[in-house]
Amino acid sequence: MERRVAARTRVLKRGTVELPESALPCKIIDLSDTGARLALSGANHVPNFFTLLIPDRPPVFCQIIWRRQERLGVTFRELPVL
């Protein structure tokens, strides 16, 4: 059953998973207005919430929806208010 709100487009861009103590390079496999599929080493160690840096776009706060080996499915969230 398809649960996506918006269709994803294959993009194959480089991005960065920004964490409080480090940054991990990733490949953005596909992208929509509401989420993305990412490939990166150490995907199992990425916390459930993080900031994704995509070239030519503002940073986006993400929540992991699924994990499979070196891949993550994320949905975009509002940045938390501090």
Ranges and model annotations:
Residues 1-82:
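Structured alpha-helical
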